[in-house]
A protein has these predicted regions:
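General beta-strand structural signal in soluble alpha/beta enzymes
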Residues: 63-66, 116-122, 172-174, 192-194
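A glycine- and small-aliphatic-rich helix-loop capping segment at beta-alpha/alpha-beta transitions
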Residues: 13-18, 77-88, 114, 133-138, ...
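Glycine-rich phosphate-binding loop of actin/hexokinase-like ATP-binding domains
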Residues: 132-222
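Short beta-strand-loop/turn "lid" adjacent to the catalytic site in phosphate-handling enzymes
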Residues: 52-97, 124-135
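A mobile "lid/hinge" subdomain adjacent to the ATP/sugar-phosphate binding pocket shared
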Residues: 222-249
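Short glycine-rich, Thr/Ser-proximal phosphate-binding strand/loop in the N-terminal lobe
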Residues: 1-39
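Gly/Ser/Thr-rich active-site cleft segment
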Residues: 93-154
């Protein structure tokens, strides 16, 4: 289950065979009714159940996996959803619809016998080497927020295609979506990657990327914007959206 800004992607697998791949679209009118992303939880959960019913898929699963949220930095891997994770995503300083993934998975799994809820490779996976954290100010350090799930899945597919193990390879992997992140993968760990949410790297369909520092400082002190408005701008209303009025590439 992958909740995104305007859609909820859902897939059903029997072993490794895909049974259903569906991108459930949410209109702007639908989402405008909800003041916060967490208010959208019943809408997205009900849409998933409705889709399964329409496709005639029995509501019987061994595991349900949701997209990981913006909690605390952790190593890559698969994590079982627990009460601490649910609390941390609900109270996270940065609210994003990815925080709903573990909640939807947990709610659906709770209705089933012997079904567990998990997340895998969330966006806050942090395996950066110490040198990669250094930036131009000793009062700051670089943080890791990136498309870990897609990058690592793509890297593993590539390794399988060439008959190698991901943990034996050195790779550069790029994710191109609403945000763009480019990671250095060294023997199964991503030791350097740009922060694709907070303004590092190339601008993208929705994100500002790296901006001229002095101009950004002047923008902050212009009195025209609040802190929250500027954070929303660099994280979702910049890039092609700001230039062209659309993120449709």
């Amino acid at each position: 289950i992958n909740p995104g800004s305007t859609s909820t992607k859902v897939a059903v697998y029997e072993d490794e065979r895909p049974v259903l791949l569906r991108n459930i679209r949410h209109t702007a009118e639908e989402l405008q009714q909800y003041p916060t992303s967490f208010d959208q939880l019943p809408l997205r959960q009900n849409k998933i159940v409705q889709t399964l019913e329409e496709e005639g898929i029995p509501f019987k699963f061994d595991a349900i996996v949701g997209r990981g949220g913006l909690t605390h930095p952790i190593p890559a891997g698969v994590y079982r959803v627990n009460e601490q994770m649910l609390h941390d995503t609900r109270t996270a300083p940065r609210q994003h619809v990815c925080n709903l993934g573990c909640h939807i998975a947990a709610a659906l799994a709770a209705d089933l016998d012997n079904c567990s809820a998990f997340i895998a490779d969330p966006v806050i996976v942090d395996e950066m080497c110490p040198e990669a954290r250094i930036c131009g100010s000793p009062d700051m350090h670089r943080n890791s927020v990136w498309h870990a799930l897609n990058q690592r899945a793509t890297a593993r597919r590539h390794a399988l295609a060439i008959g190698r193990h991901y943990e034996d390879l050195d790779l550069i992997v790029a994710h191109l979506g609403g945000g763009i992140t480019i990671g250095v993968h060294h023997h199964g760990r991503t030791i350097d990657v740009n922060n694709g949410l907070d303004g590092e790297g190339p601008f993208s369909p929705e994100r500002a990327g790296t901006l001229p520092t002095a101009d950004l400082i002047r923008m902050c002190f212009s009195g025209e914007y609040t802190e929250e408005e500027l954070l929303r701008f660099v994280g979702g209303k910049a890039g092609l959206v700001a230039w062209l009025g659309t993120s449709d590439t």
